[in-house]
């Protein structure tokens, strides 16, 4: 006969107290109505501010509930930033960073070689990449591990030269306006 454990940990391997419970790391505990978006940027590139603006616009102008978490270095300028944005027709009860995103955006092409941005992408998710390379050229720029994840997870890949779009629209240097549209 099994009985409930009065004390336990989930999500870490607790080799000190041995109170860890196993769990399904691929399970998404949120409703499928929750949009979970993660934006990778560089400190002072405007990604965090643009994501905060998107959250405000969604929260004030739609019936959707919205939540944002922002991870960045205290030095801010030049460090990697990760913005986590959720929105849903139902109240959002999640009090943690997004672990399974159905939308991932990379505002800095240089991250392709430095970060595993697709780790958080769920199968079938959308990946939006700011790239100076065209859709025909970009595949060869990806590390093999990234190519494999795109294929295995059946991700939808969208490539935009946000710097060119912004410049053509008279918004030179404002890539985040393009990437958040």
Task: Give the positions of each predicted feature.
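Flexible inter-domain linker/hinge segments
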Residues: 1-36
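Active-site cofactor/cluster-binding pocket
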Residues: 33-43, 47-181
């Amino acid at each position: 006969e099994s009985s409930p454990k009065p004390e336990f940990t989930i999500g870490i391997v607790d080799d000190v107290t041995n109170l860890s419970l196993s769990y399904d790391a691929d399970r998404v505990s949120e409703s499928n109505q929750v949009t979970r978006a993660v934006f990778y940027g560089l400190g002072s590139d405007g990604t965090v501010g643009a994501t905060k603006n998107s959250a405000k616009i969604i929260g004030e102008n739609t019936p959707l509930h919205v939540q944002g978490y922002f991870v960045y270095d205290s030095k801010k300028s030049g460090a990697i930033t990760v913005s986590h944005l959720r929105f849903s027709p139902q109240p959002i009860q999640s009090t943690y960073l997004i672990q399974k995103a159905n939308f991932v955006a990379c505002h800095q092409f240089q991250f392709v070689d430095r970060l595993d941005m697709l780790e958080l992408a769920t199968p079938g998710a959308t990946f939006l990449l700011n790239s100076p390379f065209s859709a025909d050229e970009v595949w060869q720029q990806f590390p093999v591990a990234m190519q494999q994840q795109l294929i295995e997870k059946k991700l939808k890949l969208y490539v935009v030269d946000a710097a060119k779009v912004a410049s053509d629209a008279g918004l030179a240097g404002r890539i985040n306006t393009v990437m958040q549209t």
